[in-house]
């Protein structure tokens, strides 16, 4: 009897050692990280990482294990794990993992890994040569007895693979791990999934993934990756600011007396807030008061220079299922509708908002944004008030020259840029920028040379360190040399002389037969008729310009 007790005493410690040595999901998926002992709420569809791991079918290798070098033919497989975090508690956070194969390798439509055609000169000679032909393995039943033995189509915890259509073409096993739980799935060269954050505590967490590929007798580890994600009870928001004449949108410096547009973007990739009532409360910090908007875009004009701090509070009233009416030991606290202190427990506002919803069928969530901006005097407007062509002598340059007289309102510019493009203002033909010094009045004369006569679209931009403004015009440029102008004048005078002679002859023939010798009154009448005819003649050959503004956009001004 004593001998039996001795055998039993030896067996019990041995069994305890075996149990202690059994590998668990936490040992494999934590990758050496020691997670704090915390009781996490169960995530729907996930399992505890204290479950046993089948190390025989899914071997575990340390980071420095030499077997990693031979886990994949032709090189090393890397993986990229990304997330759309941060996530508002209660919404879904999505993760996407993508495998990146060695050069010249890709996945085909059947889930096999093949060499790309004509990838490099030293690539394998045979076209579409397989790196891993898993379809052939399955068809030949080379991996166990595929008609009766399904022991290999299981996850590390022993659960069978889901047999949905096309499952045999998914030759990678993805194992995700976070907050003491794991999720397992099969897939191809990429996989994505979403997790509801209702039962995940607020704060930063790590999502880790381990990927195995199908092998002949076991699954082979090929890559690991991890990323950080955030669960918060504050609505994630981003505010973009823009202004018409602002030169640099990223420096938070804007112009006085010019509207600033504020556009609010709520980060809600899972559309958790789609059915919520959202409002935006603005305080621009300039003493103008509070503004409540129902839309995500608003504008505000600062009439004073200086530094200002703007504050935005976004409120979302989220409908939730009504909870059963149960007596509560305490009344709701007003802290739900006030700003949470930075020293408070981050999980407290979440619990209060969920346990004490207004009316029992919705909860409040808030998002906050604060930014400092600087308002300065800027260039508000630029006008082209005059364009003059410059006549050149034959010894000077033949390129036509035009002087532009421009004025501006606001601050004085420090640089001027002149851009020339085709008549449609679409194809640029060049731009010239020069520094300028304006001390008294914003009136500048800008001389611009053109390659040849023609019609051009001209843009003149005046700018300083913080702002810029633009004026445009469509102009028609004539030849610039004086010889060309002189030739044009002579031709015009010659034509004028010819037409004058013809006109004199016509007048002589017409009025000769009506000219009485002795009637002075009739003479005066004929003189009036002659004057009217000469006026008509002058109007025909010398029409007055009806264009008062040479910068009209409808037609080019001739300079």
Curated annotation (Swiss-Prot):
Gene3D superfamilies: Immunoglobulins
Cysteine pairs bridged by disulfides in the record: none
Domain of life of the organism encoding this protein: Eukaryota
UniProt topology in membrane: Single-pass type I membrane protein
Residues making up the signal peptide according to the UniProt record: 1-22
Ranges per topology, Extracellular: 23-487
Cellular component per GO, a single term: plasma membrane
Tissues in which the UniProt entry reports expression: Melanocyte-specific, restricted to the pigmented layer of the retina and the epidermis.
Coiled coil region boundaries: none
Disordered as annotated region, ranges: 329-356
Function of the protein: Could be involved in melanogenesis.
Protein name per its UniProtKB record: Protein QNR-71
Native source species: Coturnix japonica (Japanese quail)
Gene: QNR-71
């Amino acid at each position: 009897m004593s001998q039996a007790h001795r055998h039993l005493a030896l067996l019990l410690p041995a069994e305890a050692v075996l149990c202690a040595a059994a590998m668990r999901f936490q040992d494999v998926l934590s990758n050496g990280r020691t997670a704090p002992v915390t009781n996490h709420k169960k995530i729907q569809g996930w399992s505890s990482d204290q479950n046993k791991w089948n190390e025989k079918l899914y071997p575990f290798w340390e980071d420095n294990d030499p077997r990693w070098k031979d886990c994949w033919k032709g090189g090393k497989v890397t993986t990229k794990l990304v997330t759309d975090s941060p996530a508002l508690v209660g919404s879904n956070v999505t993760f996407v993992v993508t495998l990146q194969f060695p050069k010249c390798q890709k996945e085909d439509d059947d889930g096999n890994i093949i060499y790309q055609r004509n990838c490099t000169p030293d690539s394998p000679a045979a076209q579409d040569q397989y790196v891993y032909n898993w379809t052939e393995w399955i068809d030949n039943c080379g991996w166990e007895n595929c008609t009766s033995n399904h022991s290999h189509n299981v996850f590390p915890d022993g659960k069978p693979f889901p047999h949905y259509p096309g499952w045999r073409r998914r030759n990678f096993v993805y194992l995700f791990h976070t907050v003491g739980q794991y999720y397992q799935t099969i897939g191809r060269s990429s996989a994505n999934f979403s997790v509801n954050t209702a039962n995940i505590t607020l704060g930063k967490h790590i999502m880790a993934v381990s990927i195995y590929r199908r092998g002949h007798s076991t699954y082979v580890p090929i890559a690991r990756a991890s990323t950080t994600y955030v669960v918060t009870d504050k609505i994630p928001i981003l505010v973009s600011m823009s202004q018409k004449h602002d030169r640099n949108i990223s420096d938070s410096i804007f112009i006085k007396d010019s509207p600033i547009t504020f556009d609010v973007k709520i980060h809600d990739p899972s559309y958790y807030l789609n059915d919520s009532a959202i409002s935006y409360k603005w305080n621009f910090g300039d003493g103008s008061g509070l503004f409540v908007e129902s839309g995500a875009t608003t504008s505000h004009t600062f009439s004073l220079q200086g530094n200002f701090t703007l504050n935005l509070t976004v409120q979302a009233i989220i409908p939730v299922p009504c909870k059963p009416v149960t007596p509560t030991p305490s009344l709701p606290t007003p802290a739900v509708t006030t700003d949470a202190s930075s020293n408070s427990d981050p999980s407290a506002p979440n619990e209060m908002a969920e346990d004490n919803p207004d009316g029992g069928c919705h909860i409040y969530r808030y998002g906050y944004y604060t930014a400092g901006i600087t308002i300065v005097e800027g260039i508000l407007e630029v006008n082209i008030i005059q364009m003059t062509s410059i006549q050149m002598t034959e010894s000077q340059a033949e390129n036509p020259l035009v002087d532009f007289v421009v004025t501006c309102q606001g601050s004085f510019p420090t640089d001027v840029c002149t851009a020339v493009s085709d008549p449609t203002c679409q194809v640029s033909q060049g731009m010239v920028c020069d520094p300028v010094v304006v001390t008294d009045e914003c009136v500048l004369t800008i001389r611009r040379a053109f390659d040849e006569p023609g019609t051009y679209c001209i843009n003149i931009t005046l700018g300083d360190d913080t702002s810029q403004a633009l004026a445009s015009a469509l102009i028609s440029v004539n030849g610039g040399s004086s010889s060309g102008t002189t030739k044009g004048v002579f031709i015009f005078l010659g034509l004028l002389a010819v037409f004058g002679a013809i006109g004199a002859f016509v007048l002589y023939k017409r009025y000769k037969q009506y000219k009485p010798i002795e009637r002075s009154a009739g003479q005066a009448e004929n003189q009036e008729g002659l004057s009217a005819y000469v006026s008509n003649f002058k109007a025909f050959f010398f029409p007055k310009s009806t264009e008062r503004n040479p910068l009209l956009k409808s037609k080019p001004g001739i300079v």
